[in-house]
Amino acid sequence: MSSDGLIVEMRNVSRKYRFFSLQDLSLALAPGQIMGLVGPNGAGKSTTIRILMGLVPADSGEVRVFGHSMKTEQALAKKQVGYVSDDMRLFGQATLEWHMKFVASIFPGWDPAYAATLLERFNLKPAQPVKGLSHGEHVKALLLLVLARRPKLLVLDEPTTGLDPVARYELLTELMDVLKDESRSILFSSHNTADVERISDRITFIDRGRIVDSNDKEAFLESWRRLRLDVHDGATLPAAEGVVDVDVTGRIATVITRRYAPELHQVYRNAGALVREVQRMTLEEIFVATVMASRKEPAK
């Protein structure tokens, strides 16, 4: 582990492609933390995770896992990491049991009793050929093969992609049940904010190759608000700290702030506006507002 106790540490990481760049990205994951990496399709989530896993080299910056450099100590860094991606494939002709024995022969930390428990929880049959698994069952099989190794870091890259709403809900419910008594660290990427909100305690927003915000989930939900205001004729709403969007239509204004405090009511009252309603925002609404505000900022 790193000297400051971090499980994952990415510092000023950049990677340039022809039509996309990951720009000066920094990310840190603490022990026992579950971080949701949220971004639109093409935002850089998978690129970030592939660099973290050593599958793609960074052009610049530093990546450390359990204190080990991914550039010079990749084998040591990945020893305690379990990785599941939506594009991972198993041997179609082989059974799940064959895969379990294969993984157990490679990883000494394989826990057969835990594997049996996961088989039951995920409702999987070890004798079934992998080619006969549904997409949801395939994802569960991948999770079983990773979780039964008892990794200290679990990296999930868009694991619910392609699942119907019911299958996605069932998978996340089962995954949360499996993980609720665990102390491992998890990095979970998705473009679906509802998925991330269910499983994560810290949220990181990424857009166009940049981290645009990162905070504890509850901090996001408690600090963001949408305000409905009555605006008197001729009144001009002042620029208030934390306000990311203002929309005025006639005598009605909608204000979105990332730093809500009751004192904001007086600020607008002094300007000739009256706050009529204060609404909490969903994580999806917060994500969209964060991304749109970031895109309005001058390019760095």
Place the predicted regions along the sequence by residue:
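ABC transporter nucleotide-binding domains
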Residues: 5-207, 213
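C-terminal coupling/interaction segments
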Residues: 2, 251, 256-300
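ABC transporter nucleotide-binding domain
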Residues: 172-261, 277
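Alpha-helix termination/capping residues and helix-transition junctions
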Residues: 19, 197, 240, 270-272, ...
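Generic alpha-helical secondary structure signal
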Residues: 20, 75, 113-116, 218, ...
